[in-house]
């Protein structure tokens, strides 16, 4: 599922700014965490791959799979979103340029109220839609087989403030 993630992590450089933490709450919006689904989709293995390919750049990396079986988008079946995020030393520009450069169908989108940069790639040929954000010290990757890239971008902007928090000193 997020095949470009490992490549993107290796392209990061150093960054700065306010420190943030990424969390995986039990519930975000109408989505509930689905640990069994995370295991079956290989989320922990993907998280480990991102950490390994990051060569020390990715840290505090977390993963979760969220499922919504009751909201409006779930009319034709449960909507699943895989999320992997953490802290990353690097520039948002480098991360997003890497994402859009690797995938010709990728497009830049708004990162939302927390700033930074974001991009998405439509799902094709059985691969899920993917969206990513990066700012001065965090990154997040979302994938969903049930949402198109524009819908997933909207979910990124709504979910990100629920998973990214300023670290209190």
Task: Tell where the protein language model's regions lie, with residue ranges.
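Localized chelating/binding microdomains
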Residues: 38, 43-51, 91, 105, ...
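A short, solvent-exposed beta-edge/loop patch
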Residues: 116-163
């Amino acid at each position: 599922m997020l095949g470009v993630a490992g490549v993107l992590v290796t392209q990061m450089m150093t960054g700065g700014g306010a420190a943030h933490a990424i969390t995986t709450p039990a519930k975000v919006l109408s989505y509930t965490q689905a640990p069994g689904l995370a295991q079956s989709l290989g989320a922990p293995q993907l998280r480990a791959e991102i950490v390994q390919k990051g060569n020390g750049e990715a840290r505090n990396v977390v993963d979760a799979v969220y499922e919504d079986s009751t909201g409006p988008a779930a009319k034709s079946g449960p909507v699943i979103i895989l999320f992997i995020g953490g802290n990353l030393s690097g520039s948002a520009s480098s991360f997003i340029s890497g994402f859009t450069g690797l995938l010709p169908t990728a497009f830049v989108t708004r990162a939302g109220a927390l700033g930074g940069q974001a991009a998405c790639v439509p799902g094709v040929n059985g691969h899920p839609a993917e969206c990513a954000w990066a700012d001065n010290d965090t990154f997040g990757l979302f994938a969903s087989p049930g949402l198109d890239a524009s819908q997933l971008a909207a979910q990124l902007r709504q979910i990100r403030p629920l998973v990214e928090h300023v670290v209190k000193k």
